[in-house]
Amino acid sequence: MEITAKQFPYNTGVVSRKAFDDHITLYDGYVNKTNEVTHVLATQPEYATANATAGHYRGWKKGETYAINGVILHELYFQNLGSEAGPMGAKTQNLINRHFGGTDKWKEDFIACATSARGWCVLAYEQRTATCRNILLDSHEDGNIATAYPIIVLDMYEHAYFTDYGTDKAAYINRFISSIPWVLIEKRVSVL
């Protein structure tokens, strides 16, 4: 099944228009690569040579999770780039209070997680233990928790912030947090 890229408006004070447009180009590449991987696996899987060390099938299957997670994580991230943060919703506030002991403690942990991440920082609800966690992904497919439901997604790859913030990760992270669209986050939390 072929996927198509979603359209995201530029409405953010977190990154410049140039950085946003460059980022959309990278996202479009993940969409295209997902479609290519899907096609190759459907038409040329080479099942007979599959093995755990290396090979055609293994390479394409590894690429499959990398590409589709690249699509999904970027879509969630672009949705998180809100220009009007507004107040945090009651359900979100209750969830953060219950699992982190308050907004300030969550924010401190989220900042530390994002600062430590090479790829992504995700506030996620992990279903197995019924716990909210800030999780760190060093790449699209490295660090995911299988039953985690993403609530807030922050791209920490250098391409996401370097154009506008250089090496000042803290400024990027703090600007992102101050711009979280809490109405959207409340919708995500309401399904839990």
Question: Where are the language model's segments positioned?
Answer:
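Feature for soluble, non-membrane regions of globular proteins
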Residues: 1-192
